[in-house]
């Protein structure tokens, strides 16, 4: 089973993917996580990504993104492992590249208002150890400023600051909205109301998967 979650930053793709992988035999493929892992390396690819200023809200070029995503997806397909794509593809060129080697079974579009996105993104804090995500508005840690899992001090990513969020949403409107139009004629395309709580978004998707196996 090959699932795509598509939607703007802050729509809940990561959180929903986490819930789906926890309760199903699915692997979570997040380009954000893949890039963060690469940035820890001393490699030419890491240096290229750093030069792009991802932390300032800029998107990595399609050529690099396709290379990184294909490497991860090819391995899963080779092992016949079901997976969820989160954050890829996000442009028409990326979608066309993906279609060359991967047929998606479900395309879930997380539809959400911009006002709700700003609230979610600027209120988001992250654990440096386990990558757990919290939000000061609706997913607070048990102890202020500390991760529930490992008690590490939470931090706010540079791309979750207000200025960077505005850039990310502008980039999304310009590059990813055309992708929605590309997919919405596909019979596997399902629109989900992502303004509701993450748990409800997850339940809607999980129920759909159960009913349409």
Swiss-Prot record:
InterPro entries referenced in this protein's UniProt entry, alphabetically? Adenyl_kin_sub, Adenylat/UMP-CMP_kin, Adenylat_kinase_CS, Adenylate_kinase_lid-dom, ADK_active_lid_dom_sf, P-loop_NTPase
Q: Which Pfam families match?
A: ADK, ADK_lid
> What is the protein's major site of localization?
cytoplasm
Q: Which GO terms describe its molecular function?
A: adenylate kinase activity; ATP binding; zinc ion binding
Q: Which GO terms describe its biological process?
A: AMP salvage
**Which cellular component terms (GO) are annotated to the entry?**
cytoplasm
What's in the keyword line of the UniProt record? ATP-binding, Cytoplasm, Kinase, Metal-binding, Nucleotide biosynthesis, Nucleotide-binding, Transferase, Zinc
Residue positions annotated to bind Zn(2+) are 127, 130, 147, 150
The segments labelled NMP in the record are 30-60
Q: What is its EC number?
A: 2.7.4.3
Q: Where does ATP bind?
A: 10-15, 124, 133-134, 196
**Record family assignment:** Belongs to the adenylate kinase family.
Q: What does this protein do?
A: Catalyzes the reversible transfer of the terminal phosphate group between ATP and AMP. Plays an important role in cellular energy homeostasis and in adenine nucleotide metabolism.
What subunit structure does UniProt give?
Monomer.
Q: What is this protein called?
A: Adenylate kinase
Species this protein is from: Ureaplasma parvum serovar 3 (strain ATCC 700970)
């Amino acid at each position: 089973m090959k699932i795509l979650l598509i939607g703007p930053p802050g729509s809940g793709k990561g959180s929903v993917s986490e819930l789906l992988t926890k309760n199903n035999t699915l692997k979570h493929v997040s380009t954000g996580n893949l890039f963060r892992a690469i940035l820890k390396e001393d490699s030419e690819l890491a240096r290229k990504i750093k030069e792009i200023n991802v932390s300032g809200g800029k998107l990595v070029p399609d050529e690099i993104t396709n290379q990184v995503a294909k490497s991860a997806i090819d391995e899963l397909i080779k092992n016949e492992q079901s997976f969820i794509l989160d954050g890829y593809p996000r442009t028409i060129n990326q979608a066309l590249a993906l279609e060359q080697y991967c047929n998606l079974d479900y395309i879930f579009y997380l539809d959400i208002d911009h006002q709700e996105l700003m609230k979610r993104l600027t209120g988001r804090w992250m654990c440096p150890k386990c990558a757990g995500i919290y939000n000061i508005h609706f997913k607070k840690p048990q102890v202020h400023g500390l991760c529930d899992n490992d008690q590490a001090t939470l931090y706010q990513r540079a791309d979750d600051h207000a200025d960077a969020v505005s850039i990310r949403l502008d980039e999304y409107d310009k590059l990813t909205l055309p992708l929605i139009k590309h997919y919405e004629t596909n019979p596997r395309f399902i629109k989900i109301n992502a303004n509701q709580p993450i748990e409800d978004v997850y339940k809607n998707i999980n129920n759909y998967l159960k009913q349409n196996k």
